Amino acid sequence: KFRGRRPVLYHNTGDYYSSNGYETRSELMEPNFQTHMNFAPTGGRACDEAFPYFKLQCEGFGLNIAVGWPAQWKANFRSIQGGVAMQAGQEITHLYIRPGETIRTPRITIMAYEGDYARGINLWRRWYFKHILPRPNGKPIPKIMHASYNGGGPEFTESTEQNQLEYIQKYVDSGLPYNCWWIDAGWYDCTLPDGTKFWPLTGNWYADKKRYPIGLRPISNKLHQHGMSFLLWFEPERVRPGTWLY
C-alpha cells in the first residue's frame, strides 16, 4: 500500500500492431472513484497489449514501478482511502517445487522519488542506463541500423540460405552503414500438411533444412566477415502441438 494525495497512475498500452502502441495513459486513483486497474499481457509476451512499467505520481513525490518478468505477468492497482494498493507477480502460476529445487520468481523494482513527473522520468532513465541496460565489452549498446530480406513470402517463410547471402552482399555493396542483419519469424520448419509454410507454427526451433541445408552458420559467417551482428527471432514460450519442443 502506498500513501499519497491525489495519486495518478501512469501506464502504457504496450505493442498490439496499432498506431496507438506504446501510448502512455493515466488514471486518477481517488478513493471516491473506487478505481481498480488490472494489467496483464497477451500470450506470454511481456509487452503484448500491456507494459510492465508504471508510475504512481502523488502530490510532491512519486514511485516508478517495474515488474521484472519476461513472460506472463500481472499487476493490479486499486484506490484506497489515502492512497493506492498494488499487487503484482506472475500470472497463472500453479506449481510446487521438490526439496532442493529452486525457481526464479518475478523481480519487482520500486523507485521512490521526491518531485514531479518529469523528475521521476529522469531519475528512472539514469538508473536504467547505469544498472539495467547491457554494456557489451563495458561500452554502451551502439545504435543499430538493421537490414533484412524476407524472400517475398509471409514473414520469412520464403527466406533461404541463398537469398539471404545474396542480399547481405547487396546491402554491403550499397555502402550504407548497416551493422545488423535481421531474420524474423518463419526461418524454422513451419510446413503444414498441405505443404504451405505457416510462420505461427512454432516449436520446431531449428532451421528449415530444405531452405537452410546446413543451418544458419553460413549466414552468421557472412555477417561476421563484414563486421555485422545477427538478429534472429524466436519465441520459445509459444509451442504448437506436434512440434519438436512440444
What residue spans do the PLM features occupy?
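A residue-level signal for beta-strand positions that form part of recognition/binding surfaces
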Residues: 62, 102, 143
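Structured loops at beta-to-helix junctions and adjacent beta-edge loops in soluble globular domains
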Residues: 57-59, 68-70, 108-113, 147-150
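A short, polar/charged loop/turn motif at coil->beta-strand junctions and beta-hairpin connectors
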Residues: 59, 80, 138-142
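Terminal connector regions
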Residues: 109-144
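Polysaccharide-binding surfaces and accessory modules of carbohydrate-active proteins
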Residues: 1-78, 91
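Short Pro-Gly-centered flexible turn/kink motifs
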Residues: 95-114
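Short acidic, Pro/Gly- and aromatic-enriched capping/linker segments at domain boundaries
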Residues: 79-98
